[in-house]
Amino acid sequence: MEIYGIGTDIIEISRIEKAINQTSLFKRKVYTEKEIEHIEKKKHPYASYAGRFAAKEAVSKAFGTGVYGFSLSDIEILNDEMGKPYVTLYNTIKEKAKGLTIQISISHSREYAKY
């Protein structure tokens, strides 16, 4: 399998918690409705929001563009029935990724979420 690009990101969970609590716009700009619905059922939702934020940033870095030309909500991170995270892309980034497979892993500690 050919590797197109590798992206990584780490973020403090408290930064995402602060952003979410400051304005309701943050969630709508960054996360899809499916992600929000899934995360809000979690025991520790801020860790999940942060993990998905880091994963979205990492996916954008793997394409070599960062978030230029699309929205973070165009990258959706959900979990399959076994809990494994997977990526669904929308709009312009979906076209850019045509034919590619994206592998992700998300880790959390008390303070950080990492992709």
Predicted features and spans:
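Core catalytic alpha/beta fold that binds nucleotide/phospho-ligands
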Residues: 1-115
